Amino acid sequence: TGEWRVLADQLRAPVGAGYALENRLAMARMLGGLQTRLNIERHAPFFAAFRDGLAARCRRAEPRIVLLTPGRFTPSYAEQAHLAPYLGFPLAEGGDLAVLDDRVYLRTIAGLKRVDALWHRVDPRLIDPLAFDSHSGVGVPGLVDAMAADEVVVTNSPGAGMLEAPAFAAFLPRLCTRLTGANLLLANIATWWCGQGRGRNGVAGHLDNMLIAPAFGVATNVLADGVAVLGSDMPDAQRAALLADFERRPQDYVGREVVRLSTMPVVGENGLA
C-alpha cells in the first residue's frame, strides 16, 4: 500500500509550495466543481497558517512582510511571483530594500515603508554583501546587523541550511520526541551517522542494503563528487576504500535506508506508459 516518507529537507530556500498551489488552481479550473464534491483538502489553511506564523513573530499588530527574491533570472521566480500576491506579500529584490539605523525599509513611490519580516529566497551567502560575499548584487547591505538588533524577522535565516545535512536526519526522530513529546508527523528515511560507533558498525555490516552518502553534503575521500551511491553497486576497490575511510574519518558518512519509490502511469506520445 505504501506510505509517505521524507527524502530530504530544504531549509535554505524551500521550493515547491507555489507550484503545488498553481497546480491546484489549474486543476480546479479544469475540473469545475469536482474537487469540491470530492471534499479534497484545500491548500488555503496551510498558507494562512504560514502567514499567521510569520506575523505572530513580529512586534506590530499589522506587520509588513516582504518576499525577498534574487530576481527574475532565478529558476523559481515564477513560483515566487505567484506566491507573493497570494499571501499578500510585496515581492522585492535586494535593491528595493534599505537598512537605516538597523531597520529594514521597502522603497515605494510613497517613500520608505518599514519592513517587519522577510521571507527570503536568496542564497544565504549572498543575502548581505557587507557580512558575506561582497560581490553580491542580490542581497541587502546591513541586513545581518538588522537581524542582530532584532529589528527584523528573517525566516530561513542564514545558517538554517546546516540542518539539510544528511547527518542530522539520523537524530530528527529523537529530537522531535525530546522537544515536542511526539513522534514526527511524517517519518523520514532511516539514517545512521557513521560518526558514532554503533552507527558506523551497523552501516559497515550492511553495506549492500544501504545508500552511502556524504554526511554533510560535500565531497569525501571516497565519494569525491559528493553524490550518494548504493553499497551494492560499489566495486570491490571502492568498497575497500570506504571501509578504510570509516576508520579514518567516519564522521564524513551516513548510511541511509534504501526505499522503493512509487510510480504512476502517464500518458505520452505513445499512449499510456
Predicted regions and their residues:
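Domain-scale recognition of functional cores that engage charged ligands
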Residues: 1-5, 9-273
